[in-house]
Amino acid sequence: MSAPLVIVDRLVKQFGDGDTAVTVLKGLDLTLEVGEFVALLGPSGSGKSTLLSILGTLMRPTEGRLTMLGEPLVDADDVQLTEFRNRHIGFVFQAHHLLPDFTALENTIFPAATHRGRETDADRERGTALLDRVGLSDRRDFLAAKLSGGQKQRVAVARSLMNSPELVLADEPTGNLDRESADQVMDLLVEINRADGTAFLISTHDERIAGRCKRQIRMLDGRLVDA
């Protein structure tokens, strides 16, 4: 059996100091296996987005340990975290965060081009293949501002895969979409997980969306109540 993809041990996140301090995460323990497809459920304010930010190395915990792919990350410096994030983690957000004046292809290859400092022919080939995979080959040269909401989110999915990550963190990826578009995005995530073995942790309020995941974990008041 392979080693876990992610191990979280007694994770605490506190904002502020002294009497005004707010503890958002309260001693979380969590393990994600390679290739898992997991829903993270919980009400607003329960700590879901904070947990995803820490798992994505966008935020440091106050206490606890985070190990991913066997590498301890809590004591890594910013340069090491950026390198690790670019190589191993993809992101899909509720707001797509596409650059409106970039084409669908330019947005897709942005993570690779930014990391390297320039885009290559290989980047364009991979970006084109990813857009074809998400059903947008005919929108490759459209500006993001000209795409529908569902199309923008599919570009965001393609972008999250550009660097072939082992883990994609999706924070309410269907939250701004109608039911049909939400189902199309989830169809993509399910197929990518099945075909590539990419692990997904999907934060959602929607029990219907969560039901399509192979495992559900729940947060309440900064704690995992069902992991």
Give the positions of each predicted feature.
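ABC family nucleotide-binding domain
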Residues: 4-212, 216-219
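Conserved switch/coupling elements of ABC/ABC-like ATPase nucleotide-binding domains
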Residues: 221-227
